[in-house]
Amino acid sequence: MSLLPVKRRGLLFILSSPSGAGKTTITRALLEREPQLGLSVSVTTRPPRPGEVNGKDYHFISKDEFDQMVENNLLLEHAKVFGNYYGTPLGPVEAALANSQDIIFDIDWQGTQQLKQKLVNDLVTVFILPPSKAELERRLRSRQQDNEDTIRERMRKASDEISHYSEYDYIVVNTDLENSIRTAQSILQAERSKRRRITELPDFVRSLMQD
């Protein structure tokens, strides 16, 4: 939570990783611990997984609806991942930034690149790495969400996704989940205090310097 007595602009906190490295688990933990942090709820054409709630985990829409949003420039970023389409609605993000609300994104490197083209000054990007390839595969299997073909495809894609690590501001190696959560939380808290984000800082400082 920010303790600054002056208004600041919100930030976009990006977590990316190969499937199974822990970004979704870390995202959920940060949302529980950080009251000023909200989730960017993406739209997707993929079907819901067991337990997922429409409007909370994703907005589940048809491919026609997705194409319409792209055509009308209603998406901040969009990408095709494992045969399904994902995108970030523009309106809620713009409103949050203006109201000092921080938004966390659980997106891949393609989406991150698109956001950099539009809102680079508002971004804080973190890439989550697994401690080893063997551990990544173990985590994918332990989720029991995917069949064997999908697991092989995710492992094949992991090397390509990891190759984009250098495009991110911060790296977290998720060896221990709790430590990784705390590291991500520390990054978020430090970034909130950057001078350029505190929009009312000049007026506040002038008031302190007045006789």
Q: Residue locations for each model-derived region?
A:
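Conserved glycine(s) of the Walker
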Residues: 17, 22
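N-terminal phosphate/diphosphate-binding loop that engages ATP/GTP or pyrophosphate donors
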Residues: 25-74
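Residue-level preference for the first positions of well-ordered beta-strands
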Residues: 10-14, 102-104
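Extreme N-terminal, non-catalytic leader segments
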Residues: 1-12, 35
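Short, well-ordered alpha-helical microsegments
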Residues: 23, 111-113, 180-181
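NTP-dependent small-molecule kinase module
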Residues: 2-3, 145-146, 160-211
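ATP-dependent NMP and nucleoside kinases share a basic, alpha-helical "lid"
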Residues: 64-74, 88-144, 162
